[in-house]
Every structure is written in C-alpha cells, then in structure tokens.
Amino acid sequence: MSTSRRGRRTALLSALTVPVVALLLGASTEATAAPAASPLSAREINAVNTDIQANNHAMGSQIRRVEGDQSTPETKAAAQQPQPAAALPNQVAATVAGMDVASYQGNVNWGNWWSQGKRFVWTKATESTSYTNPYFAQQYNGSYNQGFIRGAYHFATPNTSSGAAQATYFVAHGGGWSADGKTLPGALDMEYNPYGATCYGLSKASMTAWIKDFHDTYHAKTGRWPVIYTSTNWWNQCVSGDFSSTAPLWVARYASSAGTLPYNWGYYTVWQYTSSPLDQDTFNGAYDRLQALANG
C-alpha cells in the first residue's frame, strides 16, 4: 500500500462517526460512536470498508476459512477443562478463560466479558507494515482498565517485508511489552495466506528464517520472546524450524481437543478453541501462571 493511500485511509478512519465492519455481538460490543471530525459520504465509508476488508485479517480467520470450525457447545465446555500434555503429565490442574479481538468487534463491552469469566485478551495491533487497528486503544486500554491481563498481536504477511521490519512496526504501534504484571508478550500470528499461496510463496527454510527474524527482533526490542500463534496443519506445511525452547505456543484448533501440536512443542500455552461467536481461548494453567507469563 502506498504512503498516500495509507494516509488517506488513516484520515478517513479518524473521521468515522460509527464503527466500521464491527460485528454486532449482542452484549459483547458497544455501538458507541466516536466524536466525528467531519461527516463522511457513503462513498468514503465504502472505501474504508473495502480497505479494511483487503488489508485487515483477524486472528484465525484464515484457519477457519481453510480448516473449518467444528466447535460445538460440548467442545467449548471441554476446552475449559485441564488437558495435560504428555510432556507434563498430571501437572496442569487449572485453566483460565480468555479471548482475542480485532477491529471487527469495534468498541468492546469489557464489563460484559469480565462478568462471563474472561480474564485475558490479545487484541490485534498491526498487519504487515501498513495496517493498524483503529479500535486498538479502546480494546487494549479498555480491557486493561477492566482488570484483564492483555497483550497485542501482529498478523504476519511474510511476502511483503522482512520479519525484522514487521516486528519493528508492531512494537512501534502497540505491540511492546512492559513489566506491569498485566501486559502479555506480543503474539505473532502465522496462518494461511489470505492473498494467495498457502505459504506466501516461501520455502520451509525461508519461512523459518522469516519467523526467526521477527522473533529475534522482537526480543531485542522488548526483552521478551513473542508468543507464536498458528495451527498445526499450517505450521507443518510451511515451517521447518524449532521455536519451542523460546516461544510459547498458542495453537488454533476448533474441536474437542488441541490435538497434535506443531513440531517439537510438548505442550501449548494457549488454545484458541472456537471462533463463535468470537475467538475464545483457554490458558493452559492456573491464574498465577498467566501472571508469570505477563511478568516474564
């Protein structure tokens, strides 16, 4: 996306009088209008909608597109139960409920989700080096003020710029980390290419190098290793490297269990177990271990 186009989109977004492309999830969202800088024509609003649809992809959107969502009320209930992995037999005795959001949720009613037992959230901050979530401040700061342990995530497009460039952009636009006990390390969202070839036209070795570039740059800038979000099917098709010794795994699988994990991870830290009515997650441990992840 050109600089002029990005500037035009930013100006249009700042002038919106209603949330754009927000999902109306009953009590889970608020349709609170931001103060209008100037009225927009229908043509301008449509241009913003088109741009968001072309340049903004929520976490798991491409996994759901390719792999489907087989979650049911029964599988969602099962996801809330401890599921110790072979690497940690009988050691996981608790879980913590969480969620992740993007611009599609608009202004989120954090009190509602808190009352439903959610205690952590990651919100989308960036995609590539051209997109920032226009609702990021409300989602990131609003959840924090409600009491959530919160973090930010970056939707990767490995064919558009280097891992270092995208990590730098992410940190500069909300993806940093602070040792306040309530901020999670940033998450790197690695999933199917929404624009074309599954692995973005990269070999497994090249994709591994790209992820390492992001992973190392993020660590250099924040002192934390990023959480890696992915599905086992995508990872095993596109990546050959091993990040299990540094990066906590956030696995996506919309079924009754997290299933087989990506290469060499012995257990998952977070499991995204459904995308309905929005992305919901479970932390694999007790609340004090979630706090430990935030504290580093």
Residues covered by each model-derived region:
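Functionally critical loop-and-helix segments that line ligand-binding/catalytic clefts
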Residues: 37-105, 242-296
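Flexible, glycine-rich phosphate/dinucleotide-binding loops
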Residues: 130, 159, 235, 258, ...
